[in-house]
Structures are given as C-alpha cells and as structure tokens.
C-alpha cells in the first residue's frame, strides 16, 4: 500500500517512541489504591496523579500494556488522543479535520463513540459523535491508513469524548471489555461483586497470602479467585485480550516479552490456603 512505510515510521515516532497521557478509571474511592498499584509496577511512568474517578499518568505504550495486564483495581485505561477548546460546531469540525486518526486506528474501523458534556455550549451528544465519525471517514478518504487483518477487525474500538467548560478531551480505550472481566469465569452469580472491587477489598483488608482465606458463601467465587491469583502472583489480565491489540501501533513481540517476564514472577503454591464453598453447586 502506498504510504505504508512513511505511516509506520510516523506511528513509531509519535505513538510508540513518545510518552503518552493515560487515564486509569476506577470506582469512586479507589483512586488512591489504584495509584499505589501503579507505583508498585516496574514502570517508568511520570506525573501520576489521583483525581476523581481515576489516575492520570504519562508513560510509553508498553507501559499501557503492562498496566492493563497487571492492575487489579482499575476499570479501564484510556489513552489521550487530543485535548482542545471548541464552543461551536465550526470550530469542532476544524480541529477534528486535523486529528491524525491514522496513527490510532486502522482504515476499516468505525469506533463506538461515547460522549458526555458538562457546562459547555456543545451538548448534543449524537451530533458530536456524528462529527467525530465523519472526521474519521473524511480522513481515511484523504490520507493513507494501514489496513487491518480479518482477525484484528474483530476487535472493537471505542472512543470517549469528555467535554467540560467547552474543553474537549478525546481518548481511545486501550482495554476493551471492562477490566473486572478477567476471562476465567465460566458461570456467574445472580448479583456478583465485580472483581476489581473484590481485589480492592482484599488489599484494604491486608490480605496475607500466608494466612488462610475462608469463603463459605463464595457465590461465583470472586473473592477466592482474586485471592488465588494474588497468591500465585498471576496478573489480573493474564487470561484475556485487550483493545490495544487492534491498534496500528501494537507490537506483538513487545507484548509477548512482557508476558514472559510476568510469567517468570509466578509463585508456585503447593497448598493454597483458600477454602471456598457455596450451597449452590453451580
């Protein structure tokens, strides 16, 4: 494809080679716990700040990979695309027309767009989402994009647009399904606790892997499974995939290296001190 090599160089220079801004979202009240988790990982991240709803940080793309893989208490991790002011549609369309969507998405993708607006002149969510999708289509008609394989095209992409006091913040979701979905459960309970909240409760309670954990009304086993993964030092996202695997900047060699390094840290537990039961055999 014409323009493929120059585009790959731009992706490497602007997305892979530079630090990017990220936002790890959390349940209310867990921001500090998420911040502590981030700081405990082997990451060279900068400017980590806990704010309402999550933690902002700067880092390289592979650190986004590792945060998705390892964090127990975050819901999703967003990568910032751009931030700008716009108080009317003319200004919005002008700024959107300059966004380098080809660095973030393959040509075939029409992402889901989620919009929220607060204290802003532009508040019509559907109209704003339409402008976003239109700018992406126009850009793909005029500028070379990389084409995705059939496998990559099956990975949904999701943009988040937040508008506050006429300032737009556009982000792309690196996680895909919410991160509490660990990819290990076969059956769910009627009203299950999210794994992120169970992990937070265990951390706040000071769970010690050397001490017994007794879960006599375990339901779908959320607490016990989280404790088991912690006791063996298995990353929270070990058994699942992520949306960033469908990005043009994704490098499977780096991802596989990170997984191999994480696997070296697994703990072998001869007799796990976790006892779970429930009257419902399912």
Language-model-detected regions and their locations in the chain:
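Non-catalytic nucleic-acid substrate-recognition regions in nucleic-acid-modifying enzymes
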Residues: 2-157
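Solvent-exposed alpha-helices and their adjacent loops that cap or buttress functional pockets
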Residues: 16, 152-153, 162, 207, ...
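A residue-level signal for conserved active-site and pocket-lining positions in enzyme catalytic cores
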Residues: 38, 113, 161, 201, ...
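A generic beta-sheet turn/junction motif
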Residues: 50, 163-165, 220
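Short glycine/proline-rich turn/loop motifs
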Residues: 114-116, 179-182, 267-268
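C-terminal edge-of-domain segments
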Residues: 159-175
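SAM-dependent Rossmann-like transferase core, predominantly class I methyltransferases
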Residues: 170-204
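Conserved S-adenosyl-L-methionine
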Residues: 193-282
């Amino acid at each position: 494809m014409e323009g493929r090599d120059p585009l790959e160089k731009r992706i490497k220079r602007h997305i892979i080679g530079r630090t990017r801004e990220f936002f790890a979202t959390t349940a209310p009240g867990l921001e500090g716990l998420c911040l502590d988790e981030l700081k405990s990982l082997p990451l060279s991240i900068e400017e980590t700040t806990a704010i309402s709803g999550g933690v902002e940080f700067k880092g390289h793309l592979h650190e986004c990979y590792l945060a998705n893989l390892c964090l127990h208490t975050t819901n999703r991790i967003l990568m910032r695309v751009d931030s700008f002011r716009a108080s009317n549609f003319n200004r919005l369309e002008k700024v959107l027309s300059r966004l380098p969507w080809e660095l973030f998405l393959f040509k075939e993708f029409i992402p889901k767009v989620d919009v929220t607006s607060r204290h802003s002149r532009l508040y019509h969510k559907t109209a704003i989402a339409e402008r976003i999708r239109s700018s992406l289509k126009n850009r793909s008609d005029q500028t070379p994009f990389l084409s995705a394989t059939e496998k990559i095209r099956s990975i949904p992409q999701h943009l988040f647009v937040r508008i506050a006091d006429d300032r737009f913040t556009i982000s792309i979701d690196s996680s895909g399904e919410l991160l509490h979905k660990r990819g290990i459960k076969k059956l769910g309970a009627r009203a299950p606790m999210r794994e992120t909240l169970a992990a937070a409760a265990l951390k706040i309670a000071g769970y010690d892997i050397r001490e017994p954990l007794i879960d006599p009304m375990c339901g779908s086993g959320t607490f016990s499974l989280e404790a088991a993964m912690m006791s063996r030092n298995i990353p929270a996202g070990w058994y699942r995939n992520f949306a960033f695997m469908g990005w043009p900047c994704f490098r499977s060699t780096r991802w596989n290296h990170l997984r191999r390094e994480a696997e070296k840290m697994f703990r072998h537990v001869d007799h796990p001190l976790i006892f779970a039961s429930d009257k419902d055999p399912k």
